[in-house]
């Protein structure tokens, strides 16, 4: 069985005081969570302080980005080994905001995937289509092409102990999510494509949904067979909203003890 995975992506939000208060609240709220996995991705400046508060908690640490190099003259970047030193478990790569604002392409993202696997961190590969691609019916082919770049470079084995997050670009931050039924179709197409290479990997890989996830709509996403959790943006910055999402996952029929 696949455990539901809930990740809060805080993006470029918060300051020392607000983030500290949010972390303390979440740690105290999630002390008895045992049937789903939870992680938070604070801004890089606050990874260390977050790590300290997460010690002995039920919450794991996720990075929002990683460089393709382990060391060298790369001003402003952070390596996978540096993240490892901070007890980071997951790292987001391929997020649409990185693709759009930093011009990261599939080949560059595949290098990030490689370096994370080399160090032993779990990559969360974000895939998804823009509004034009969605309207043209290219959703599934766009996602498959983004995944196929990883397979071409690293082989299907790279997806062992990895995560894929389907995030329709047009839904992120818009307040309009994909319908759970349509999201399920995309998730199934991704799992089926991976199964065409290796059914065991396909059965075990976690595929999250992201894009305007809220406490009000999250249950219907969890109800879908191939949706194994959610990548939460704005709602994860509100302790009550994020707690409701995590508690819904904890109580869902898909969840089970470690």
Swiss-Prot record:
GO BP field: gluconeogenesis; glyceraldehyde-3-phosphate biosynthetic process; glycerol catabolic process; glycolytic process
GO cellular component: cytosol
EC numbers, comma separated: 5.3.1.1
Binding-site residues, substrate: 9-11, 173, 212
Cellular compartments annotated: Cytoplasm
Molecular function in Gene Ontology: triose-phosphate isomerase activity
Biological role stated in the UniProt entry: Involved in the gluconeogenesis. Catalyzes stereospecifically the conversion of dihydroxyacetone phosphate (DHAP) to D-glyceraldehyde-3-phosphate (G3P).
Annotated protein name in UniProt: Triosephosphate isomerase
Subunit annotation: Homodimer.
Pathway stated in the Swiss-Prot or TrEMBL entry: Carbohydrate biosynthesis; gluconeogenesis; Carbohydrate degradation; glycolysis; D-glyceraldehyde 3-phosphate from glycerone phosphate: step 1/1
InterPro entries attached to this UniProt entry: Aldolase_TIM (IPR013785), TIM_sf (IPR035990), TrioseP_Isoase_bac/euk (IPR022896), Triosephosphate_isomerase (IPR000652), Triosephosphate_isomerase_AS (IPR020861)
Active-site feature positions: 95, 167
Keywords: Cytoplasm, Gluconeogenesis, Glycolysis, Isomerase
Reactions performed catalytically: D-glyceraldehyde 3-phosphate = dihydroxyacetone phosphate
Gene source species: Blochmanniella pennsylvanica (strain BPEN)
Main location: cytoplasm
Family: Belongs to the triosephosphate isomerase family.
């Amino acid at each position: 069985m696949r455990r539901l995975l809930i990740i809060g992506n805080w993006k470029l939000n918060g300051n020392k005081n607000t983030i500290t208060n949010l972390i303390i609240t979440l740690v105290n709220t999630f002390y008895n969570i045992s049937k789903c996995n939870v992680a938070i991705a604070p801004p890089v400046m606050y990874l260390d302080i977050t790590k300290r508060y997460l010690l002995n908690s039920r919450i794991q640490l996720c990075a929002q980005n990683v460089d393709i190099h382990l060391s060298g003259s790369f001003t402003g970047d952070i390596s996978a080994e540096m993240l490892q030193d901070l007890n980071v478990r997951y790292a987001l790569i391929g997020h649409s905001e990185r693709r759009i604002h930093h011009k990261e392409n599939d080949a560059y993202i595949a290098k990030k995937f490689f370096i994370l696997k080399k160090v032993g961190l779990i990559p969360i590969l974000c895939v998804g289509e823009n509004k034009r691609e969605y309207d043209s019916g290219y959703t599934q082919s766009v996602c498959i092409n983004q995944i196929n770049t990883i397979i071409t470079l690293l082989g299907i084995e790279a997806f062992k102990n990895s995560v894929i997050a389907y995030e329709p670009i047009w839904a992120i931050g818009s307040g309009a999510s994909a319908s759970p039924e349509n999201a399920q179709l995309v998730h199934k197409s991704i799992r089926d494509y991976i199964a065409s290479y290796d059914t065991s990997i396909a059965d075990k890989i976690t595929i999250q949904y992201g894009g305007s996830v809220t406490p009000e709509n999250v249950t219907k996403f969890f109800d879908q067979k191939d949706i194994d959790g959610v990548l939460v943006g704005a709602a994860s910055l509100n302790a009550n909203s994020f707690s409701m999402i995590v508690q819904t996952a904890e109580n869902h029929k898909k969840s089970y003890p470690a």
